[in-house]
Curated annotation (Swiss-Prot):
Bilayer topology: Peripheral membrane protein
Enzyme Commission numbers on file: 2.4.1.-
Protein name from the UniProt record: N-acetylglucosaminyltransferase
Secretion signal, residue range per the UniProt entry: none
A Gene Ontology term for the protein's cellular component: plasma membrane
Amino acid sequence: MTLLETTSIAAVSLYGLLSSSYRSVQVLHAFRTLKSETAENTVEESSLPSVDIIVPSFNESPARPVRLPGIPCQPRSYPGMLRVYVADDGSRNRDAVVAEQLAYAGDARFEFIMLPRNVGKRKAQIAAISRSSGDLILNVDSDTTLASDVVSKLSQKMRDPAVGAVMGQLVASNQSDSWLTR
């Protein structure tokens, strides 16, 4: 065997060993996470933190209003107190926000904040956060669809005093539309 062949075999073998070790660590970590999530699911409802969801919006199309799918079904998986603040950032055409306002008019968990002029996404978020009173705040874009159990999972992670912030996994809804989003 030549030096090149020996080196190639050693490199491929080392790569295989490192890859399988890495995968093993991932599997062990996943099992540990699953066990801790199962234990966390037995939390008393009274000890759950209140969660405020902040949704800034600007110039949403009336044909595609502010998307709140997933938010109304959060209480089924998260029995704690939940409130939603939708902050319209001075849109020129407020038809989309008004349509959402009417759709959730009977639900006390929803509050719509209409800013008089466009001040930017961050200031719209700040306007909503200043009205919120929850123990935890979840910032969501107006075009985001939430999984039905996201509030429950994120609040469970925040129970650890060593954790200062958590983030869910983001998946683009248009991920297969073009080479850029793939």
